[in-house]
């Protein structure tokens, strides 16, 4: 589930020497933590907030987009970039269009020490980077700049259509919870005796491949 601001504050009280709070949001299921509230807590204690937004690189492009279509209301959680995080890591290859293994480290405000970050990166990065991978990041940035609005609109339309039609499938339960990213679709057919693996095999036979199977989801 989501990481609560109170849990973050409890952790900071237990570990007063900590210099930063690092947390993932959204998680693998698309559940987002309240980064805005967490950032307020973290900064009140004089710490940095680092968000691993590996599964949420797309959220920035959905901000402010509410959609009411096919009788379905879609709203999207805010990105960590817009919620006060100091450092945000986006795995652009997961939900955007860059090649596998690519990601972006975003730094905001004056709290992070840019020089220290650059020094640490030199210790872990290769001295022979893949220019193919780096080029794919540039291409992804250009794509989202030039066609991002159109692509996101089509994405929203497809999501609305899916959720509208899924309502008519007897026994199909779709996970709904506060802070859930609608682009992450969590299906449960246990009402018909389907386990998660059964549902995965059923979908695979029809050319649809699940990203994760866990229990009945």
Q: Which residue stretches match the model-derived regions?
A:
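Conserved PLP-enzyme active-site core in the AAT-like
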Residues: 1-176, 189
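Conserved C-terminal alpha-helix-loop-beta "cap" of PLP-dependent enzymes
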Residues: 161-217
């Amino acid at each position: 589930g989501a990481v609560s601001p109170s849990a973050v504050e409890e952790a900071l009280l237990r570990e007063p020497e900590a210099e930063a709070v690092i947390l993932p949001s959204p998680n693998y299921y698309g559940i987002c933590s309240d980064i805005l509230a967490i950032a307020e807590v973290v900064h009140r204690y004089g710490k940095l907030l680092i968000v691993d937004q590996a599964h949420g690189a797309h959220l920035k492009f959905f901000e402010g987009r509410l959609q009411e279509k096919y009788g379905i209301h879609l709203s999207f959680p805010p990105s960590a970039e817009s919620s006060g995080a100091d450092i945000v890591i986006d795995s652009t290859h997961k939900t955007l269009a860059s090649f596998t293994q690519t990601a972006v480290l975003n730094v905001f405000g004056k709290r992070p020490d840019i020089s220290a970050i650059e020094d640490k990166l030199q210790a872990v990065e290769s001295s022979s980077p893949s220019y193919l991978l780096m080029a794919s990041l540039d291409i992804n940035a250009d794509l989202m700049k030039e066609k991002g609005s159109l692509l996101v609109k089509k994405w929203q339309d497809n999501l609305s259509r899916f959720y509208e039609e899924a309502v008519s499938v007897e026994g199909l339960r779709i996970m709904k919870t506060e802070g859930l990213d609608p682009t992450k679709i969590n299906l449960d057919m246990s009402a018909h005796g389907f386990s998660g693996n059964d549902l995965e095999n059923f979908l695979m036979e029809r050319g649809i491949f699940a990203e994760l199977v866990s229990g009945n989801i």
